[in-house]
Curated annotation (Swiss-Prot):
Name of the protein: Methylamine utilization protein MauL
InterPro entries: Cupredoxin, MauL
Source superkingdom: Bacteria
Pathway stated in the Swiss-Prot or TrEMBL entry: One-carbon metabolism; methylamine degradation
Gene of this entry: mauL
Primary role: Probably involved in TTQ prosthetic group biosynthesis.
């Protein structure tokens, strides 16, 4: 029987965990702390794993007049390559895949001066695959990119 409103049922209920007796309020606090730690550990694990998956890089290629400027990167599967048109003429860059598929890098097929187009190396690209960047308008503009797959993606012998 309750004497007044301050005496709540949950304050009088006791639980036994092992040899320790805890009130219901202590259980709630314990569960909250446990859930908080579980959340933090799970979030940390997911961020660690996803940072490995997010290891793709963004590379820059510069297009000036009738040639690509020399580049110093080796593309890996999943890397994005941004191609910036620094010339004062229009270009129309496309990529030829190793299997012969051709992909335009601009919806209009024209890359105006100052415009940047992007291409992402396919995730299923294999070590040694060669992707050729060319211009539809100026066929002399050509760059061959050989993919170097990370060791973790190479098949075991």
């Amino acid at each position: 029987m309750l004497r007044n409103r301050t005496d709540a049922v949950h304050d009088r209920v006791r639980f036994s965990i092992g040899t320790r007796v805890m009130s219901s309020w202590s259980i709630v606090v314990w569960m909250f702390h446990r859930q908080t730690w579980q959340f933090l550990l799970t979030t940390g694990f997911i961020l660690c794993i996803s940072s490995i998956a997010w290891s793709a890089e963004v590379h820059q290629m510069e297009l000036t007049h009738h040639e690509f400027e020399p580049w110093s990167f080796v593309p890996k599967p999943g890397d994005r390559i941004d191609i910036h048109n620094h010339s004062d003429i229009v270009h129309a860059i496309y990529v030829t895949y190793p299997n012969g598929i051709v992909v335009n890098l601009s919806e209009t097929a024209a890359q105006l001066p100052g415009m940047t187009v992007s291409w992402t190396v396919p995730e299923d690209a294999e070590d040694g695959d060669e992707y050729v960047l060319q211009c539809w308008i100026h066929t002399i503009i050509r760059a061959a990119l050989k993919v170097k797959a990370p060791l973790s993606q190479l098949p075991e012998p």
